[in-house]
């Protein structure tokens, strides 16, 4: 039978109703229920993976404050011409006011594959390692791009994060970086002739790319350092 409201009230000198759970038991029950839900959602085949993404994807987008921009991506005026096969430009999203510096290494006209290489300290970090990464990809016919993700390289900006609840009302640096990766991937996917887009995350940028790929549709491949 249902408890009477008066019997559920607890005042000084009055105990809990018989069988009432303690605060700790309530918390344990909620945790156990969520763990069971996650276990049931754990992917075991392609259909399970699709269901997992459908259920948990909105939560990830909400937690990061990031989304796939699609046709909302805008390309700003090139900050340089095509010099030695390299072009500098900036990307943004319509109505958002963001700016993502991007460097593009040209590929042969017949190229159908593109890769975004994301370093933790900005584009210059990739340039310093061209002999080991960018040039081999170019020789194999890849269109290669890299970005200065939020608060790295030329996109550095001072942020006062001393407020105790800063992340309640503002995106963290890493959340903004995930969005920048998504913006660049979306732009690459819309390049004429490009049929496959892959993603590489170096060092500390690996986790940014792992989070971004969960919100990016149909990437050909993802290689990301995940031990940071």
Describe the predicted segments one by one.
Residues 1-113, 122-143, 150-153, 158-190, ...:
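Alpha/beta-hydrolase-fold serine-hydrolase catalytic core, especially in secreted/extracellular enzymes
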Residues 200-210:
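Gly/Ala-rich beta-loop-alpha elbow adjacent to hydrolase catalytic centers
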Residues 211-215:
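Active-site signature of alpha/beta-hydrolase-fold catalytic machinery across serine-
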Residues 148, 200, 225-226:
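Alpha/beta-hydrolase-fold catalytic nucleophile elbow
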Residues 117-119:
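Charged, long alpha-helical assembly modules
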